[in-house]
Amino acid sequence: MLEKQSVNQKEQYNFNKLQKRLRRNVGQAIADFNMIEEGDRVMVCLSGGKDSYTMLDILQSLQKSAPINFSLIAVNLDQKQPGFPEDILPAYLDKQGVEYKIVEENTYGIVKEIIPDGKTTCSLCSRLRRGILYRTATELGATKIALGHHRDDILQTLFLNMFYGGKLKGMPPKLMSDDGKHIVIRPLAYCREKDIERFAVAREYPIIPCNLCGSQPNLQRQVIKDMLRDWDKQYPGRIETMFSAMQNVVPSHLNDHKLFDFKSITHDSDIIDGGDLAFDREALPLNPVGWQPEDDEDTEKRPSVRLDVLEIK
């Protein structure tokens, strides 16, 4: 009995630290990018996946202690995919006491009608979904649209654009929507996916599978995701360092002449951004920048977590 109590206490201790870390990361991202302001009505896009559940959960938690007043409304888009469990999200949100709206639009039927069998449907589906969510935000009077992308998503997008698009372009934590009417925010921008996975397991969210439409996963993104996960295991701190690099950009030391005016550099110019070592190697720190060992006692022993996804029959 004492041993069981000790295990439960340790689990609760680790969960509390995990929740605190997620709260801190979300709070810091909100502050750094001024994501949420006094009086904001934040439309939280809820898909039924681990990321959006966690985002809503943490925002609710922060709302209680925030120095500003803001409201939340969860929005789910029921795209009429076969087998979509329509009762799951309303039941969960009613239990949480969250204001919400379920938007029913048969985008699945539109996509199936336009895209031939066997072809990827994600691009068209995404455009349709985006337009509906923008319209819904206007109808609800939402001042911000919150999406559940996390740090790993941002890094994956950076490498996708580098490897396949020839661009140094990631996924911004805050942006103006492509229709020019809405501000989109990503409160989980500083959060690690593995933290979100552990949190979702502990909270026992009713996870809805993401492939009800039958579409194949993005193979390019999966390759990048696997690469980053391998690096995270083999080279602790590399992911944190790369993310830090995205926040410490030095345009004068890149090659984009549209971003920095190299042509104006003359013998009369001042040293720019510390100059360059030119002939010498730059001394780098022994430990990766931005990395600290995880503080959970059983990190090394902890097995990979597995989310219990609802079985749709």
Swiss-Prot record:
Transcription regulation as UniProt keyword = no
Q: Pfam families under this entry?
A: ATP_bind_3 (PF01171)
Kind of enzyme, top EC level? transferase
The answer to whether the entry has keyword Lipid biosynthesis is no
Highest taxon in the source lineage: Bacteria
Show the GO cellular component annotation of the record.
Answer: cytoplasm
Q: Which family does it belong to?
A: Belongs to the TtcA family.
Would you tell me the protein name for this molecule? Answer: tRNA-cytidine(32) 2-sulfurtransferase
Organism this protein belongs to: Yersinia pseudotuberculosis serotype IB (strain PB1/+)
Q: What is the lineage of its organism?
A: Bacteria, Pseudomonadati, Pseudomonadota, Gammaproteobacteria, Enterobacterales
Q: Which gene encodes it?
A: ttcA
